[in-house]
């Protein structure tokens, strides 16, 4: 991996949670719970104070996704990003509504592999595997087993 050739593209950053960033998780859950409950039915419901709305986040990530059309077929890209970004990309690939992504388990340091092909119709993607890191750990180290 030659990081000298790495591009850092802010379009792939996690959603800006505004005032919720840095808040202890227990407090964050209490404050954000009503928004996340409403979000399951209305994408516009997630709008952290002084942060990025889910709709703006979705549009930013999907624009970056479409920019992958600029790469030639058979390119190999490594995208290092956050769970929120995957909650936009994976449902897009799988044809799921974006607010139905919460059943997808996306733990820290997991990785997914997508195969992308471009055509006149646009970008076609296939999910080859998801959440491989959870299965790479021995059972004693993996709290999900």
Where are the predicted features?
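Phosphate-handling substructures
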Residues: 1-62, 141, 145
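Ser/Thr-centric signal marking residues that sit
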Residues: 53, 81, 112
């Amino acid at each position: 991996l030659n990081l000298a050739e790495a591009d850092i593209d802010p379009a792939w950053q996690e959603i800006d949670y505004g005032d919720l960033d840095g808040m202890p998780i227990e407090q964050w859950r209490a404050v954000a719970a009503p928004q996340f409950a409403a979000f399951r039915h209305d994408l516009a419901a997630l709008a952290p104070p002084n942060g990025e709305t889910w709709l703006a986040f979705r549009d930013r990530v999907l624009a970056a996704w479409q920019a992958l059309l600029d790469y030639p077929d058979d390119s190999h890209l490594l995208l290092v990003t956050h769970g929120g970004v995957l909650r936009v990309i994976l449902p897009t690939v799988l044809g799921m509504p974006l607010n139905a992504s919460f059943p997808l388990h996306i733990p820290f340091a997991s990785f997914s592999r997508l195969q992308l092909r471009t055509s006149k119709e646009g970008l076609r993607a296939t999910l080859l595997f998801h959440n491989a890191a959870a299965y790479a750990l021995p059972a004693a180290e993996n709290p999900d087993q």
